[in-house]
Swiss-Prot record:
PANTHER family noted in UniProt: GMP SYNTHASE [GLUTAMINE-HYDROLYZING], GMP SYNTHASE-RELATED
Protein name stated in the entry: GMP synthase [glutamine-hydrolyzing]
Organism phylogeny: Bacteria, Pseudomonadati, Pseudomonadota, Gammaproteobacteria, Enterobacterales
Keyword annotations: ATP-binding, Glutamine amidotransferase, GMP biosynthesis, Ligase, Nucleotide-binding, Purine biosynthesis
One MF term in the entry's GO annotations: GMP synthase activity
Species name: Salmonella heidelberg (strain SL476)
Catalytic activity entry: XMP + L-glutamine + ATP + H2O = GMP + L-glutamate + AMP + diphosphate + 2 H(+)
GMPS ATP-PPase domain ranges (all copies): 208-400
Active site (UniProt): C86 (nucleophile), H181, E183
Gene responsible for this protein: guaA
Length: 525
């Protein structure tokens, strides 16, 4: 019998802040399970979830507007601690009898709050002291409205010159509000405040750890599928790889992985996937060489979105054909992770701002009545990686840079041809190898090479040549929503360029992309 790792749980109500998923990740980092729900949940849903505590997130709306979101009244009647962050504090104050006003002055960026009153939330937590010995906290503010009167049964815990109620508390009811964002690293003691709330005030045990998550997932897979057979599309990416390892641990040879080699992978990637999962870990893998099929389907197509659709469609066709060859498979496994679940829920309700449509393996043949197994669907990406390490997958594989689902299909601009893919693979491998050698790979968030379908004149020896151009791209980002181009050293870029032009016959020029996001996207297509 595995331990119930969901026993203590925090409910986070999302009012639309860009940082809300970060709040959830911070709570998970503290070893406590949490879920992220839209703000307008019902009393019955909250009762059913039975949280140990509730966090009200920040959000872009103004509580002074008539139809702005409000926390369900039951939040304040459930008898559990409540922590309001930024907008969450404002709606708490307003709903419990305080007052909020719009302000002409937005407070955005660093601020120092002075702790005036002892509180369980910040006791013993400080960044520095005032001349008369009062604790000061360095925090990150991002708000326009502010609380101008707190509810009568609350006390002011901390303030700044422009924000008289930076922290408010009702210690008896264990209700706390902060006008800043404790979840961002700029609030230096933010993690300690969250820990104080989650672990001490809500009294949650740290049961959410990689080893226990694995035990729980294995037990749940066995309970769900029993002795049935399961099929998984293994791409070699982080999510499908960790899914494969979890399923293999749970059901062994009853798992069949289908690895579709579409000819759009990185250099030697197909061989590496087969060696690692087949030979080293002993998984049951069907290797489907399908390069010709993908490239002929892509022939003549220049439009990026059309290329994505073609690659997706052909993948599903190939996967379906392989699935039909297997006898008695009852379950399809997918590497869906928690942000995918949040995005789909948001697109279904229209509440959050969906950035992209997410595609996992879809469109199985109608004659295949299969159940769905999604062992990662409660996990954030950083948690998936930690679990992968615990399961024995190599660090370099788990922490390598993102690679798009359509692969080189969207890194070869315009029409995709085998010749272009082969040149790009070799150029990209040199760039990545040099980044690793220079200890720069982990210092950038993503780096790759793009094939440009234009020829340029070059000189090699005594002769002229007329060959292709590639662009190097490297960015630094925290969340991939915005990004800066990476300021790689000139001598490093020169070395990479020299190697590519000398070692990859067919490329005569290398350029470096210095566009930020926005206005450019990270990928070119």
């Amino acid at each position: 019998m595995t331990e119930n790792i969901h026993k203590h749980r925090i409910l986070i109500l999302d009012f639309g802040s860009q940082y809300t998923q970060l709040v959830a990740r911070r709570v998970r980092e503290l070893g406590v399970y949490c879920e992220l729900w839209a703000w307008d949940v019902t009393e019955a849903q909250i009762r059913d979830f039975n949280p140990s505590g509730i966090i009200l997130s920040g959000g872009p709306e103004s509580t002074t507007e008539e139809n702005s979101p409000r926390a369900p009244q039951y939040v304040f009647e459930a008898g559990v601690p409540v922590f309001g962050v930024c907008y969450g504090m404002q709606t708490m104050a307003m709903q419990l009898g305080g007052h909020v006003e719009g302000s002409n002055e937005r407070e955005f960026g660093y601020a120092q709050v002075e702790v005036l009153t002892d509180s369980a939330l910040v006791r013993g937590i400080e960044d520095s002291l005032t001349a008369d010995g009062k604790p000061l906290l360095d925090v990150w503010m991002s708000h326009g409205d502010k609380v101008t009167a707190i509810p009568s049964d609350f006390v002011t815990v901390a303030s700044t010159e422009s924000c008289p109620f930076a922290i408010m508390a009702n210690e008896e009811k264990r209700f706390y509000g902060v006008q800043f964002h404790p979840e961002v690293t700029h609030t230096r003691q933010g993690m300690r405040m969250l820990e104080r709330f989650v672990r001490d005030i809500c009294q949650c045990e740290a049961l959410w750890t990689p080893a226990k998550i694995i035990d729980d997932a294995v037990a749940r897979i066995r309970e769900q599928v029993g002795d049935d057979k399961v099929i998984l599309g293994l791409s070699g990416g982080v999510d499908s790889s960790v899914t494969a390892m979890l399923l293999h641990r749970a059901i062994g040879k009853n798992l069949t992985c289908v690895f579709v080699d579409n000819g759009l992978l990185r250099l030697n990637e197909a061989e590496q996937v087969m060696d690692m999962f087949g030979d080293h870990f002993g998984l049951n893998i069907v290797h489907v060489p399908a390069e010709d099929r993908f490239l002929s389907a892509l022939a003549g197509e220049n439009d990026p979105e059309a290329k994505r659709k073609i690659i997706g469609r052909v993948f599903v066709e190939v996967f379906d054909e392989e699935a039909l060859k297997l006898e008695d498979v009852k379950w399809l496994a997918q590497g869906t992770i928690y942000p995918d679940v949040i995005e789909s829920a948001a697109s279904a309700t229209g509440k959050a701002h969906v950035i992209k449509s997410h595609h996992n393996v879809g469109g199985l043949p109608k004659e295949m009545k299969m159940g769905l197994v999604e062992p990662l669907k409660e996990l954030f990406k950083d948690e998936v990686r930690k679990i992968g390490l615990e399961l024995g997958l190599p660090y370099d594989m788990l922490y390598r840079h993102p690679f798009p689902g359509p692969g080189l299909g969207v890194r070869v601009l315009g029409e995709v041809k085998k010749e272009y893919c082969d040149l790009l693979r070799r150029a990209d491998a040199i760039f990545i190898e040099e980044l690793r050698k220079a200890d720069l790979y982990d210092k950038v968030s993503q780096a790759f090479t793009v094939f440009l379908p234009v020829r340029s004149v070059g000189v090699m020896g005594d002769g002229r040549k007329y060959d292709w151009v590639v662009s190097l791209r490297a960015v630094e980002t925290i969340d991939f929503m915005t990004a800066h181009w990476a300021h790689l050293p000139y001598d490093f870029l020169g070395r990479v360029s020299n190697r590519i032009i000398n070692e990859v016959n067919g490329i005569s020029r290398v350029v470096y992309d210095i566009s930020g996001k926005p206005p450019a996207t990270i990928e070119w297509e």
